[in-house]
UniProtKB/Swiss-Prot annotation:
<comment type="function">
    <text>Putative gamma-glutamylcyclotransferase.</text>
</comment>
<dbReference type="InterPro" id="IPR009288">
    <property type="entry name" value="AIG2-like_dom"/>
</dbReference>
<keyword id="KW-0808">Transferase</keyword>
<dbReference type="InterPro" id="IPR013024">
    <property type="entry name" value="GGCT-like"/>
</dbReference>
<dbReference type="Pfam" id="PF06094">
    <property type="entry name" value="GGACT"/>
</dbReference>
<comment type="similarity">
    <text>Belongs to the gamma-glutamylcyclotransferase family.</text>
</comment>
<keyword id="KW-0012">Acyltransferase</keyword>
<dbReference type="GO" id="GO:0016746">
    <property type="term" value="F:acyltransferase activity"/>
</dbReference>
<feature type="binding site">
    <location>
        <begin position="14"/>
        <end position="17"/>
    </location>
    <ligand>
        <name>substrate</name>
    </ligand>
</feature>
<dbReference type="InterPro" id="IPR036568">
    <property type="entry name" value="GGCT-like_sf"/>
</dbReference>
<feature type="active site" description="Proton acceptor">
    <location>
        <position position="55"/>
    </location>
</feature>
<protein>
    <recommendedName>
        <fullName>Putative gamma-glutamylcyclotransferase BH1612</fullName>
        <ecNumber>2.3.2.-</ecNumber>
    </recommendedName>
</protein>
Length: 111
């Protein structure tokens, strides 16, 4: 995301992170879940449009693979999350650590 400013390379939301089996993760947001690691960026409207296109998300469409939700972080700031529902076909293998980057590195080292 050219021009987007990274505020935090290791921040957290609560939920369950899954390996979709397609090379990217899927998040179920759940305040009772474990910590899920992410990055926080300051973006503009064009960045948001680009992210929506990347995630194949359309605000006016009834059936998206992901839903974009506004989330409040522990410090009171807000961010958007792209989340799935528990019945999503992307919910495959639970990532117990909640850390996608660690998960993919560990998978590479065991293959």
């Amino acid at each position: 995301m050219r021009g987007a400013r990274c505020h935090n390379r290791r921040c957290y939301v609560y939920g369950h992170l899954y390996d979709s089996g397609l090379g990217y993760p899927a998040l179920i947001a759940d305040e009772k879940g474990g910590k899920v690691v992410g990055e926080l960026y300051e973006i503009n409207e064009q960045h948001l449009v680009s992210l929506d296109e990347l995630e194949d998300y359309a605000p006016d469409r009834n059936h998206n693979l992901y839903e974009r939700v506004l989330h409040t972080l522990e410090d009171g700031s807000h961010c958007y999350l792209y989340v799935v529902t528990p019945d999503s076909p992307l919910v495959r293998t639970l990532i117990p650590s909640g850390d996608w980057l660690d998960w993919t590195e560990n998978k590479k080292s065991t293959e």
